[in-house]
Amino acid sequence: MKKVLTLLLMFGLSFAAFAQMVDPVKFNSKLEMLKGDEAQIVFTGKIDNGWHVYSTDLGNDGPISATFNAVKMDGVKTVGKLTPKGHEISEFDNMFGMKLRFFEGSVTFVQKIKFTKPTYSINCYLEYGACNDETCMPPTEVPFTAEGKSPAVSEEAASESPKEVAQAPAAEEE
């Protein structure tokens, strides 16, 4: 009977430990309007001590790079690449055998967008990798969704085709 109780207790404790998975990075996301017909999707992360989040464009042979992934973007298009902001650390990593770029403490990733229609619907996510000195988390997604009226795109501008310009007749030679 003691063995069964001990086994059940160990199973219960291991289940409780599994339920409290490590979440060393907490992200917030928001849409910031810029001038005219542009905006930016901002992902801001707070990183626990001892952990780091990898930067963008690290290549295929290393850890998971931070990437912007569009599920559905209607009425907007991306402008440029995902841009990391913060104090980026660059150093050789023995575990991966390569020079890596990462952030500790905090990081912000920004994706600029441009509105193309009078209304928009955005469904996207940031994917990132995080490690400490002993382990790495599986690739993690930070979802972002938003919809609304575009700030600087009118119905006319969105549907208007370029106007044909009449050419002036050539001057006659005398």
Predicted regions and their residues:
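Sec-dependent N-terminal signal peptides
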Residues: 4-17
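Extracellular/lumen-exposed scaffold segments
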Residues: 18-174
